[in-house]
């Protein structure tokens, strides 16, 4: 029978519930417990796919093509569990499902209400997502006290009763602010947050207290007394310079032992040696490289969460410190590429919209002409093709139809037809809805023999995750290949271009991929493409300093 750990948050948002939940999952998994994670988002959007990165941050794509919250990326990076459409749902999805049932007559003429119909639907979604796991760690988005979260909190309250006390554990993450004028951490916000939770009918079993300094013993006892939890269940979550230190931090305070005791689980001792080794690699690099990250949302790095982590993973696996320099592509448009001169490698990530594209193209041209290692992801690959078409193949006005509908050389165009993972043909047009209509999820890619891509992956066939509407235009691809562009990866059914590169005698390391390899990178194994990219940056750094 699956047991449940519910994680809620109070006082303020952005305290790190996702990291806390993922870290707990990592510790429990190290004890031989099969875990899964769910994220319950209280917004009315059906999914975050059409939300602005400034509003939501990164959209994480699962193997089965779900556009989900970035916390699912943390879950996959910290544990071996693979997330799917069942692991993230929103108020919008719940209401949509209930309304469809009402239209079909499944409620037999009853008045459809938040309680019981919405809460019952939430519970059924939670149980479906938790199937097959020993422990499901369920994170409830938002902050206790928000109106939007109430149906979710009521649903998990009911599950606490229905599943039984030994099958549920409630963890509440809260904030202990330090007031310099008073010279102490303040517990009152935590007390009020727990009071609010208890008024809903949920008594937390464990408190995770975010703080910038250690919590004195007398303050812990005070929190325990007034929040009705055991003193050992008041656990401090101190600010850390790496999220990968959090599992060890929580294990040292016996969080996993308290959870296992509450759930009646007998399990072997935790083994966090993998995490300890990763931290050692992170803190003892043998060299450093400087990577130019040329993007549009560089003031909000949460928009590129998985990509930043993938670069950090590559650093761990190459014993190097990766210094990421976030460069606004619009600033490059205005001021030129001088800022790139001291960089060991250049990366252009995915993105949408015309703003800043010419700055990205200028950075790509600089990488190609100066033989700087280059990695282009999604839009970064498309713009690499545009730059090659313009500056090498003689197609001076080449562009993507996403940005210039009337371009005479549409080297990038809308994908109108492709095969999904099951082989089903998907079709789209310019008039299709924005939400859920991209080429999404895991897709097979065939790699050409003798290419850098084939060497990097060590395999002729790979599976990577996609999120895009536009692709390289096959009708113009042959002309680009004649001029020296190497198509190193193709989709086996539709022949869509998935990877491009430059020959080794032209450039030491220049790769573009239509997919998002960052979604499958994790700290334990890294990802071959990012590891090879950082190695190329190290080689350039050594040669330039040589």
From Swiss-Prot:
Keyword Plastid found: no
Modulation of this protein's activity: Allosterically activated by GTP, when glutamine is the substrate; GTP has no effect on the reaction when ammonia is the substrate. The allosteric effector GTP functions by stabilizing the protein conformation that binds the tetrahedral intermediate(s) formed during glutamine hydrolysis. Inhibited by the product CTP, via allosteric rather than competitive inhibition.
Positions with a binding annotation for Mg(2+): 71, 139
Catalytic activity: UTP + L-glutamine + ATP + H2O = CTP + L-glutamate + ADP + phosphate + 2 H(+); L-glutamine + H2O = L-glutamate + NH4(+); UTP + NH4(+) + ATP = CTP + ADP + phosphate + 2 H(+)
Binding site for UTP: 13, 186-191, 222
Entries under NCBIfam families matching the protein: PRK05380.1, PyrG
InterPro entries assigned to the protein according to its UniProt record, in alphabetical order: Class_I_gatase-like, CTP_synthase, CTP_synthase_N, GATASE, GATase1_CTP_Synthase, P-loop_NTPase
Provenance organism: Azoarcus sp. (strain BH72)
Top-level taxon of the source organism: Bacteria
Entry function: Catalyzes the ATP-dependent amination of UTP to CTP with either L-glutamine or ammonia as the source of nitrogen. Regulates intracellular CTP levels through interactions with the four ribonucleotide triphosphates.
Binding site for ATP: 14-19, 71
Enzyme class, UniProt record, top EC level: ligase
Gene Ontology annotations of biological process type: 'de novo' CTP biosynthetic process; pyrimidine nucleobase biosynthetic process
Lineage of producing organism: Bacteria, Pseudomonadati, Pseudomonadota, Betaproteobacteria, Rhodocyclales
The protein's name in its UniProt record: CTP synthase
EC number in record: 6.3.4.2
Catalytic-site annotation from UniProt: 378, 516, 518
């Amino acid at each position: 029978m699956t047991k449940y750990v519910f994680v809620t948050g109070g006082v303020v948002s952005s305290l790190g519930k996702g990291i806390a939940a993922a870290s707990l999952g990592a510790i429990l998994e190290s004890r031989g417990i099969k875990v899964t994670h769910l994220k319950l988002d209280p917004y009315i959007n059906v999914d975050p796919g059409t939300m602005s990165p400034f509003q939501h941050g990164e959209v994480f794509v699962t193997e089965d093509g779900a556009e989900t919250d970035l916390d699912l990326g943390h879950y996959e990076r910290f544990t071996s569990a693979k997330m799917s459409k069942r692991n993230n749902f929103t108020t919008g999805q719940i209401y949509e499902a209930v309304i469809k049932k009402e239209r079909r007559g499944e409620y037999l003429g009853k008045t459809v209400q938040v309680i019981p119909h919405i809460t019952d639907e939430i519970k059924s979604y939670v149980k479906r997502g938790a199937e097959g796991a020993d422990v499901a760690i369920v994170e409830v988005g938002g902050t206790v006290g928000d109106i939007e979260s109430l149906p979710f909190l009521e649903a998990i309250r009911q599950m606490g009763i229905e599943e039984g006390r030994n099958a549920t554990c409630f963890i509440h993450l809260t904030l202990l602010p330090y007031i310099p004028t008073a010279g102490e951490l303040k517990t009152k916000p935590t007390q009020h947050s727990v009071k609010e939770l208890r008024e809903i009918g949920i008594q937390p079993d464990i408190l995770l207290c975010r703080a910038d300094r250690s919590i004195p013993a007398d303050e812990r006892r005070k929190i325990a007394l007034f929040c009705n939890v055991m003193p050992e269940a008041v656990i401090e979550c101190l600010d850390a310079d790496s999220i990968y230190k959090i599992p060890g931090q929580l294990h040292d305070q016996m969080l996993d032992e308290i959870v296992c005791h509450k759930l009646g689980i007998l399990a072997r001792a935790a083994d966090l040696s993998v995490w300890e080794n990763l931290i050692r690699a992170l803190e003892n690099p043998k060299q450093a490289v400087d990577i130019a990250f040329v993007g549009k949302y560089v003031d909000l790095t949460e928009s590129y969460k998985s990509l930043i982590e993938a670069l950090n993973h590559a650093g761990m696996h190459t014993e190097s410190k990766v210094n990421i320099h976030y460069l606004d592509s619009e600033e490059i448009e205005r001021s030129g590429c001088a800022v790139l001169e001291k960089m060991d490698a250049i990366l252009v990530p995915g993105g949408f919209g015309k703003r800043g594209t010419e700055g990205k193209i200028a950075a790509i041209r600089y990488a190609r002409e100066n033989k700087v290692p280059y990695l282009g992801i999604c839009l970064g690959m498309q713009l690499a093709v545009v730059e090659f078409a313009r500056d090498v193949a003689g197609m001076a006005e080449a562009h993507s139809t996403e940005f210039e509908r009337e371009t005479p050389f549409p080297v990038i165009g809308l994908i109108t037809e492709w095969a999904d993972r099951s082989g089903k043909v998907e079709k789209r047009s310019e008039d299709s809805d924005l939400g859920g209509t991209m080429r999404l999820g895991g897709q097979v890619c065939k790699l050409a023999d003798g290419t850098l891509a084939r060497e990097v992956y060590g395999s002729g066939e790979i599976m990577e995750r996609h999120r895009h509407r536009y692709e390289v235009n096959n009708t113009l691809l042959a002309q680009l290949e004649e001029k020296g562009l190497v198509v190193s990866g193709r989709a086996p059914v539709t022949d869509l271009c998935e990877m491009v590169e430059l020959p080794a005698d032209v450039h030491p390391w220049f790769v573009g991929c239509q997919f998002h390899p960052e979604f499958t990178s994790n700290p334990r194994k890294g990802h071959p493409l990012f590891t090879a990219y950082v190695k190329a940056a190290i080689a350039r750094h050594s040669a330039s300093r040589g």
